Structure formats: structure tokens, C-alpha cells
């Protein structure tokens, strides 16, 4: 059963919808659906449609730019990809370095034929792989702190990995059964689809469940004086 994130959303005044990435056998329960536009349209070109309650539907036949990261479909050879990322995008100082980074990336192997990205669907919780909070800096600070509530010092729960924007939704996690969180929306190519002050905080399903537990604990940092003082300093709301 999907836990209720209402305490987080309401306390932090999160105005953007929480966005789930689902790996499912049937897209019908996620309607209304939208498909990526022609060519290599960015996954985040659908952001305005997520706000309208619609879900982006990706398949190996219709996938836009997200195919390599979310569906395992390779549009370019490895050599072409390295050349593009280094020579055109300037993301690493050399081809050799970029090769090392690509080798180290966990990657994502879909379980089903349909990847669906859109507002949370409680009835489809079995197929949920990650949840993304689109937040400002204050909201992000509170969520980063909350994600450490149950963690050990030798197991840092939050990272900010290198990847494309869509890769930060799934392919950087590796093990989805572990509570993990990432600070995302750091890909310059996708940021034009977001408002300037927004960043992404993407979590695995186990971390989402822990965050909801954290929010329900009256002794947690979501209910402390420092947060109340911060909210007051911001005029009563984030």
C-alpha cells in the first residue's frame, strides 16, 4: 500500500505534483496518457502535462530521448556517445574519462514493456520504482535532512550523481530495494523545461516509505523549532 506523503507536502508547502516512475505491464491504469513528440524529445518536455495530471508513456517504439537511460535502447554506438558527450557537450575533459564514467553507471533494466512517468497512482504502487519531489532550496534542505533520519554514518543516503535528467530518475540507483535519494535536475539540457528555482529530489520506494514514516514522527526534524523558524522567516510558507 502506498504511504501518504500529505504531511510532507502540506508542511513544506510543496506545490508541484509528486512524480512517479513506473515500470508496468499495462499502461491503461495510468490514463490520461501522452506520448513523446517526434525525434529525441526530452522526457521533461512533458513537465507541463504532468502538472495537468497526465502521464508520459514510453516504449521501445516511442521513447523520445529517454530510451538509453530508461528502456535499454541504444540510439548511438558507445564511441558516438562518448564523442557527443565530450566533444559537443563538454561534460568531461577527455574521452577516456567519459568512458570510465559510463562504465561505472549502474544502468536501468526495465521489467516490463511500458515506462510511465507522471503523478502518483496509489493503486499502481506495486510498479513504482522512484518518486520525485520538485522543490526549491528550502524544501530540498528539509528533505535531505529527513532522508538521514534512519541512516547509519557509513551508509550516506543522499548523493548527487552525474547523469542525464531522465537517468537521475532511475538508472543511477542500481539497487531499488535500498533506501536511496539523489539530488537531481542538474542536467543543463533538461533544465529549460523547469522553473529556474526547482531542483529534483528523487527517491527509491523504500526511501519514500521511510520519509513518510519520518513525517509522521512528531519527534522528527519535520516538526522542530528550526523548521518553524525557517517557515516564519519565509513569510509563513515555502
Positions of PLM-derived features:
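Acidic, serine/proline-rich low-complexity intrinsically disordered regions
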Residues: 2-238
